[in-house]
Amino acid sequence: MRIAEITTPDLRLHHRETDSHTHHPLLSEIELLIQQSEAISKDQPLPQSLPISLRQFLTRLSQLAPFPDNSFKLTIWKLSFRLWNACVDLANAASLQSSLTSAENIANLRHVAADMLFLAKDVTGVPSPTIKSSLFYYKTGLVYHSLKKFDLASDCFERATEIVSKIDIAKISDAGEKKLFLDLNLARSRTAWEISDRNLAVTLLNRAKNLLFGSPDHYKSLSNQFLAFGKSSLSRGDDDCSLNDALRLMNEALDLCEKGLGTAKTREDTTEFTAMRIKTLRFISAVHLQKGEFENVIKCVKVLRNGGNGSDGADQHASLPVLAMKAWLGLGRHSEAEKELRGMVGNNDIPEAVWVSAVEAYFEVVGTAGAETAKGVFLGLLGRCHVSAKAALRVAHRVLGESRGGDNGSRIRANVVAQLVSDERVVALFASEAVTKERKAIHSVLWNSASDHFRAKDYETSAEMFEKSMLYIPHDIENRVFRAKGFRVLCLCYLGLSQLDRALEYIEEAEKLEPNIACSFLKFKIYLQKKEHSCAIGQIDAMTSCLDFSPDYLSLSAHEAISCQALPVAVASLSKFLSFYISGKKMPTTEVVVFRTLVTILTQDIGSETEALNFMLQAQSRASKLGTECFFGLGETGKREQNWFAATCWNLGSRCGKEKKYELCGEFLRLASEFYGYIDTDESGEDKLMICRSIILSVTAMIALEKQTKSALTETQVKLAAELLVRAGKIMSSSLSDGKDCIMEPELIFMYTLLAYDIHGRLNNSAFQLLVVKTFAGSKSCHYNYLLQLGIFASQSPQSNPDVSTFALNECLSALIASASPEYPTIALIIRKLISIASVHKGDTDDEEAILKMYKQAYRIMVGLKEGEYPTEEGKWLAMTAWNRAALPVRLGQFETAKKWLSIGLEIADKVTGMDTYKACMQDYLAGFQTKVSSA
């Protein structure tokens, strides 16, 4: 504010005296600068050089003290007042521009004006010059304080205090001057508080107690300042020191209120002191609450509510139920706390933020047990007054808390919130566009809670929360995707609950809003769990038609089908998966893995061997087309895959063979030979051996099928068998030439020989038949039993070959005779067989001689044997057949030939037990025959 010019008679006299004197040059310079400050327009900023220049001239002026006369001082006084008034005008203009730099310059200019007035403070003729000088410093200090220039403010306040300290307070009668003494102390105290000199600040307030002068206004000012410092300490922190300071300062404020009531002379003063006292008590309650002194809080609240100690009525401030509730909670008396909380519903003066905070505080302490109370309070408030969407969001979020789901407490909280947010009034709070942000937030809160319960496998609670979150998604085009997402997760929840029909309803709704692969896949899962396999297989085709389809979903579908034991569905899914490889599309999984998985699935299901064979054939075809490294993979990985396919074919072929499924057995074993052929043969030759085994058993299965079906092999089948055996023969020949025949089982070589004989007999290749048997006879694997079987088979099969049979049986006979302990029954059998073959296929005299030689060989074998060592029946057969062979030569007159047969028959009979009667007759006949021949 501007300070009026002094117009007393004495000053007018001094003014005339001053005008009669010539101004000092320094004063003239100062006046020129003041005129500049007065001439500055409102739109112009104060030059920064002006305060500096004035300060320099003032410094020079101070060097002239003491001043020569009173008129000189009066001139300085007037210049100071002019400068001050100019500062007031400049400050008013600067306030419109809000320039901090300009405000600081004006404050500096004020400081110059105060210093100028201080130089002439002992001027005569001016009332209370000392008080006025002090006032300039006080007001300048206030400006510096507002600019947060606390050091400069403190300097000004201290200078003002020094000036008035020389005045006897008892002699002051003016109320304004008395107020200045108090205000100076309060201002110094505030500045000291700001620069964290708390002790000085409190000391100055305590000094101010001596400057009250019984004035109600003084009591109010000092009490308010104590309260302000107490609030500052309370807000500074929760440490005991800060809280104790706050309590001490507030008690001082309360004490001053009590004393101030005694000085009140008007109803207005009494009302103000009462309001201050109530306010201070509330803050004291807050401090006790912070300190955990809950009993003291309750006492304060009771005092306030009872309206005691001079109060006209009970205090109904909105903070009281909150303070009381928190205190009761601190004392563990939850029922009283609940009463306070419910009582807030009927208090219309309680702001929304306060009761929401109270609900949060109550629930934080009581926890899950307070969920219903929190809901009831909120709905009660909803029916009483307007509640914002933000408040509803806060309550829902607080009740849900940070629970991760899965426990009973979080389930109860979720159920309470579900009831709360599904209330039509709550939903209506979020309906307008103005609360879009809050609507998204509460949807997120509900969604996250549902997700937590879903992860904890509490699908029932999760479904409820997801359903409630759908209430906060608008039914417009922009939110179609969000609604579809909600329906999809609800489908997952009901899948988890095995409520498949409801899950299907939700996913169909989602598909209407946003048809995509996720919806299609979930429908597939539902069909699987409903065991509607045909629908599931149909859904596979639906998935592939989706715009966002990825082959990964087919792999995932197969896994789902396997887990549900729906093997046909898994096969259908993987079969579809294979079609993408044929098209050349880049896939995340190698083709061989898909084939392997398919075959593995099919082998688990007995009766699916035909399908498994088809996929094995496809795999072999793809391997041939792409190359083994490309199809199976490189290195050890590829080798493992090749081994798996080969071994699986072998195992399936063996299983089918045991089950007499010879057609499948043959195909699997043939494929096994192909897969084993892909493997790089190791030094041990094990893989080559497996190729031979597979081929030999494959051809064996073909012949077994022929016998089973009683249908002869076709020409194509015979040629295929021949080709397979040629391949096996080459491998065996290679192994034998390398000296590795020891690793091949003799039985395997025998089977090969037998099969080769059979198949080439069908091709009328008798020369090869003899060659293959001779080759076998010359190998280390040959045993007389094998030769015996070959000989018998060659003599009895449809493709009989007497040359092969004779060779095999002769080789067998030689081996038996050469053994240390010959098996004479077998020898006898072979001799009979050889005689029979020769008898059937004889063509000339040489054959007759060969037969005779066999009989003689049999006789030589029998010579020296113990009785019965050579089979008696076979001996009799030899003797009788030899004797009977003489009949034809006798009739033909071939007496010499007849004699040979009669003689060998008699010789053999002589070695056979039990032929004595026959032998006597034979001897008589032979003697008579010889006589007859001699006489002829």
From Swiss-Prot:
Keywords: Chromosome, DNA recombination, Meiosis, Nucleus, Repeat, TPR repeat. InterPro entries: Spo22/ZIP4 (IPR039057), Spo22/ZIP4/TEX11 (IPR013940), TPR-like_helical_dom_sf (IPR011990), TPR_rpt (IPR019734). It is found in: Nucleus; Chromosome. GO terms for biological process: female meiotic nuclear division; homologous chromosome pairing at meiosis; male meiotic nuclear division; regulation of synaptonemal complex assembly; resolution of DNA recombination intermediates; resolution of meiotic recombination intermediates. The keyword rRNA processing does not apply. Its main location: nucleus. PROSITE patterns: TPR (PS50005), TPR_REGION (PS50293). One of its GO terms (cellular component) is chloroplast. Coiled coil: none annotated. TPR repeats lie at residues 134-167, 223-260, 278-311, 443-476, 484-517, 879-912. Disruption phenotype: Short siliques and low fertility due to defect in meiosis. It holds the Pfam family TPR_8. It comes from the Eukaryota. Required for meiotic chromosome segregation. It is involved in interference-sensitive crossovers (class I meiotic crossover) formation, in both male and female meiosis. Is specific to recombination events resulting in interference-sensitive crossovers (class I meiotic crossover). Not required for synapsis completion. This is TPR repeat-containing protein ZIP4. The lineage of its organism: Eukaryota, Viridiplantae, Streptophyta, Embryophyta, Tracheophyta. The gene is ZIP4.
